[in-house]
């Protein structure tokens, strides 16, 4: 008699974050978060909590206010010692590179926005070489404008004595894309 090996697929645990604004009421935000939860599930993540905040508009620095970001951080710390710690926070909007970097530094987990989540799903599902190439191109197009903000912590790399100023980190990143 054969024995079957049962293996568990390890999924990441996620938190969803959305804003309630004048343009997007609470019902619409709930609908968008329901859709985002479905997308997260499709990508292999398990949603355990939703955070919403009523604001006039997103914060340019961290998308949500400092108090809400603190609430999210406290929840992540609370779940650290459990079997399934929080692995990512998914925002129901497109984040700037500055927002992503600031939020990631504050929370210490992977940060995704709706666009990057959708691109990840397409990358997972792409079958043909052509489809994989198209998804990769879309991911690069998405990343390219964010390179400048991602590498603000790095200085220009010198070109050496007599060989000019050298290339900046953004230029090196663009070349690699």
Roles of regions detected by a PLM:
Residues 1-114, 118-120:
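N-terminal accessory targeting/assembly segments
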Residues 106-168:
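Canonical P-loop GTPase G-domain recognition
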Residues 171:
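Active-site-proximal binding-pocket segments
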Residues 175-177:
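Conserved small/polar residues in nucleotide/adenosyl-binding loops
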């Amino acid at each position: 008699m054969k024995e079957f090996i049962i293996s568990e697929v390890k999924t990441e645990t996620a938190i969803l974050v959305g804003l309630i604004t004048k343009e997007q009421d609470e019902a619409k935000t709930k609908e968008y978060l329901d859709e985002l939860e479905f997308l997260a599930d499709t990508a292999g993540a398990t949603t355990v909590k939703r955070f919403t905040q009523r604001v006039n508009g997103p914060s340019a620095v961290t998308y949500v206010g400092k108090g809400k970001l603190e609430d999210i951080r406290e929840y992540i710390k609370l779940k650290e010692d459990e079997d399934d710690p929080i692995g990512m926070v998914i925002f129901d909007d497109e984040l700037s590179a500055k927002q992503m970097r600031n939020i990631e530094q504050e929370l210490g987990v992977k940060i995704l926005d709706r666009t990057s989540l959708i691109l990840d799903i397409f990358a997972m599902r792409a079958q043909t070489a052509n489809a994989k190439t198209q998804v990769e191109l879309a991911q690069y197009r998405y990343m390219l404008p964010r390179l400048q903000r991602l590498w603000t912590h790095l200085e220009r790399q010198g070109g050496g004595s007599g060989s000019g100023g050298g290339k900046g980190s953004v230029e090196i990143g663009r070349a690699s894309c």
